[in-house]
Amino acid sequence: MPQLNTTTWPTIITPMLLALFLITQLKLLNSHLHPPTPPKFTKPKLHAKPWGPKWTKVYLPHSLPPQY
């Protein structure tokens, strides 16, 4: 039975591991290069409403009978 020739394995495996290491480092560097910006807290603008702050009509739910 012939023997498996393994003389070129270190030549192939070493650059492969180096390439995987470099790709992983570049991905990690790229993901941490720009941290997410914090959200800006702004106060909501209050617009003048012509109808005022109170309700004009109150509606009952459909499940209740009308009350007079």
Swiss-Prot record:
One Gene Ontology term, aspect cellular component: mitochondrial membrane
Parts of the chain that traverse the membrane: 8-24
Modified positions (N6-succinyllysine) in chain numbering: K54
UniProt keyword Ion transport, yes or no: yes
Localisation per UniProt entry: Mitochondrion membrane
Sites bearing N6-acetyllysine, chain numbering: K54, K57
Topology versus the membrane: Single-pass membrane protein
GO MF terms, alphabetically ordered: proton transmembrane transporter activity
Keywords from the named record: Acetylation, ATP synthesis, CF(0), Hydrogen ion transport, Ion transport, Membrane, Mitochondrion, Transmembrane, Transmembrane helix, Transport
Record flagged with keyword Mitochondrion: yes
Top-rank taxon: Eukaryota
Gene Ontology biological-process entries: proton motive force-driven ATP synthesis
Pfam families with a match to the protein in the record: ATP-synt_8 (PF00895)
Quaternary context: Component of the ATP synthase complex composed at least of ATP5F1A/subunit alpha, ATP5F1B/subunit beta, ATP5MC1/subunit c (homooctomer), MT-ATP6/subunit a, MT-ATP8/subunit 8, ATP5ME/subunit e, ATP5MF/subunit f, ATP5MG/subunit g, ATP5MK/subunit k, ATP5MJ/subunit j, ATP5F1C/subunit gamma, ATP5F1D/subunit delta, ATP5F1E/subunit epsilon, ATP5PF/subunit F6, ATP5PB/subunit b, ATP5PD/subunit d, ATP5PO/subunit OSCP.
Function recorded in the entry: Subunit 8, of the mitochondrial membrane ATP synthase complex (F(1)F(0) ATP synthase or Complex V) that produces ATP from ADP in the presence of a proton gradient across the membrane which is generated by electron transport complexes of the respiratory chain. ATP synthase complex consist of a soluble F(1) head domain - the catalytic core - and a membrane F(1) domain - the membrane proton channel. These two domains are linked by a central stalk rotating inside the F(1) region and a stationary peripheral stalk.
Recorded family membership: Belongs to the ATPase protein 8 family.
Protein name stated in the entry: ATP synthase F(0) complex subunit 8
Organism, as annotated: Pongo abelii (Sumatran orangutan)
Gene: MT-ATP8
